[in-house]
């Protein structure tokens, strides 16, 4: 089986607001909408929306045993683990075990997440070397 598919639609459109689900424990601060999921592997793509003024400091940071990719779609989000503001357009490919958060936002933020919970083993490059951050010239 593979990840679910769908035709074009706009999850950010006003008429789609009822599809956003409050994140348990973060009600009033953050909500999510799953865009695609593989029921066998658990791999998923979702949007997480942090509402203006959200602050998850009381919950601490987190890590996952699996890799994930994040892209800041809109707004800005402060990641305490990295001591920096993430602005719209920023991207990260997090390795398993990377600490991130807690988060806060002043204006709100939408984050695209692609997560791979089935990939808990250390990933390696095709030549057997460990994967690292993308190299720039």
Task: Tell me the role of every PLM-derived stretch.
Residues 31, 68, 107:
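Residues that flank catalytic or metal-binding motifs in active/ligand-binding sites
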Residues 58-80:
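Glycine- and acidic-residue-biased ligand/ion/polar-headgroup-sensing regions
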Residues 48-50, 71-77, 112:
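Short, well-ordered beta-strand segments in beta-rich or mixed alpha/beta enzyme
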Residues 1-44, 127-137:
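A short, N-terminal "cap"/entry segment at the start of jelly-roll beta-barrel domains
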Residues 28, 96-122:
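Ligand-binding loop in jelly-roll beta-barrel domains
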Residues 28, 33-64, 83, 95-99:
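Conserved short histidine dyad/triad with adjacent acidic residue
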């Amino acid at each position: 089986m593979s990840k679910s598919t769908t035709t074009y639609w706009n999850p950010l459109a006003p008429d789609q607001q009822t599809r956003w689900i409050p994140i348990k424990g973060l009600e009033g601060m953050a909500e999510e909408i799953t865009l695609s999921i593989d029921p066998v592997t658990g791999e998923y793509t979702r949007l997480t929306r942090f509402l203006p003024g959200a602050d998850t400091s009381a919950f601490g940071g987190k890590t996952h045993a699996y890799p994930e990719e994040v892209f800041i779609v809109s707004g800005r989000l402060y990641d305490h683990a990295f001591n920096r503001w993430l602005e719209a357009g920023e991207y990260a490919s997090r390795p398993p075990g990377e600490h991130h958060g807690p988060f806060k936002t002043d204006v709100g933020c939408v984050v695209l997440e692609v997560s791979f919970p089935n990939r808990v083993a250390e990933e390696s490059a095709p030549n057997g070397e460990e994967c690292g951050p993308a190299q720039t010239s």
